[in-house]
Amino acid sequence: MLATPTIESPEEAARRAKESTLLSPRFYTTDYAAMNAIDVSSIRAEWDAMLAEYEGDNNHDHFQRTPEFPQEVAERFSQVSPELRQEFLDFLVSSVTSEFSGCVLYNEIQKNVENPDVKALMRYMARDESRHAGFINQALRDFGLGIDLGGLKRTKAYTYFKPKYIFYATYLSEKIGYARYITIYRQLERHPDKRFHPIFRWFERWCNDEFRHGESFALILRAHPHLITGPNLLWVRFFLLAVYATMYVRDHMRPLLHEAMGLESTDYDYRVFQITNEISKQVFPISLDIDHPAFRAGMERLVHVKTKVDAAKARGGLVGRLQQAAWAAAGAATFARMYLIPVRRHALPAQVRMAPAW
């Protein structure tokens, strides 16, 4: 595997955050008029209960660093290898970019709609994501690598997504984020000696924010049944596979991070897939067959393709560009074959909302 370019300066951290690749977090814009037309009257009771939870703000005091935090960073992190240091810094940069992406999107929606239900929801979620991004950015500042988030908002490229794509992608991003964080938290509670940075101690209550955000999009999707039936199921299937594949490939580019926690990247990812499959039954009538041999082989093939694309990019020149194109086509073909693997089908529950019980 090729070495990841090192993050040693704020400029490199900012450059990494600004990247627009298949695997990097993106910034989004959408159709605000369509967002304004969202109607949640069919799930009013569950919606109002959820907004009351946001208003209660049970995490208002959670994202505060303890006085011991910097000392623990100095003591624990001084023991990690340079390679692990780089993978962890890459994780922080990717995470702060992802959290801030949500903050920017939700804030822009709430500024551009009049619908009181949507406006209130987006304001609450932007508040949460702002806290998350700020907390991670402070962890980067401990290494002298803080990112100018205002500058990132102005300079990073934006991708236009229709509202339904926002709903699918963001629902899955929030729920898979919950599954990732809670799996790491539980592992490190069992093995505190492997907690090489204090930020992981915040993950339990943190991931409950992610879970609640996902609940919000679950309610929106269930309030608009046409988004999860008929031809739109093809889009559901696409986003399920795209989100899972992106996570799998990205995680296998930084295996030392999981190894340091006592996890193995493949086992960890399939545990996260399993949790996300169970959760997403609240809103999607289909789920990916993650145990199908062709699914697992396809994921491994995508990792192999990524390493080949990176090698071709490093080679450069005409030959390198031709190799990149060939391997990119191989990746697209692999994704297409995985898309055709039969999915599992199930009935939707009468009650949409669920508790974070993992």
Swiss-Prot record:
Q: Which reaction does it catalyse?
A: Mg-protoporphyrin IX 13-monomethyl ester + 3 NADPH + 3 O2 + 2 H(+) = 3,8-divinyl protochlorophyllide a + 3 NADP(+) + 5 H2O
> Which InterPro entries does this UniProt record tie to the protein?
AcsF, Ferritin-like_SF, Rr_diiron-bd_dom
| EC number(s) given by UniProt | 1.14.13.81
UniProt keywords, alphabetically: Bacteriochlorophyll biosynthesis, Chlorophyll biosynthesis, Iron, Metal-binding, NADP, Oxidoreductase, Photosynthesis
Xref: Pfam families = Rubrerythrin
Q: Which residues cross the membrane?
A: none
Q: Which cofactor does it need?
A: Fe cation
Which GO terms fall under molecular function for this chain's record? iron ion binding; magnesium-protoporphyrin IX monomethyl ester (oxidative) cyclase activity
Query: Which pathway does the protein contribute to?
Result: Porphyrin-containing compound metabolism; chlorophyll biosynthesis
**Could you provide one GO biological process annotation from this protein's UniProt record?**
light-independent bacteriochlorophyll biosynthetic process
Tell me the function of this protein: Catalyzes the formation of the isocyclic ring in chlorophyll biosynthesis in aerobic conditions. Mediates the cyclase reaction, which results in the formation of divinylprotochlorophyllide (Pchlide) characteristic of all chlorophylls from magnesium-protoporphyrin IX 13-monomethyl ester (MgPMME).
Similarity comment text for this entry: Belongs to the AcsF family.
State what protein this is by name. Aerobic magnesium-protoporphyrin IX monomethyl ester [oxidative] cyclase
Q: Whose protein is this, by species?
A: Rubrivivax gelatinosus (strain NBRC 100245 / IL144)
Q: What is the phylogenetic placement of the source species in the record?
A: Bacteria, Pseudomonadati, Pseudomonadota, Betaproteobacteria, Burkholderiales
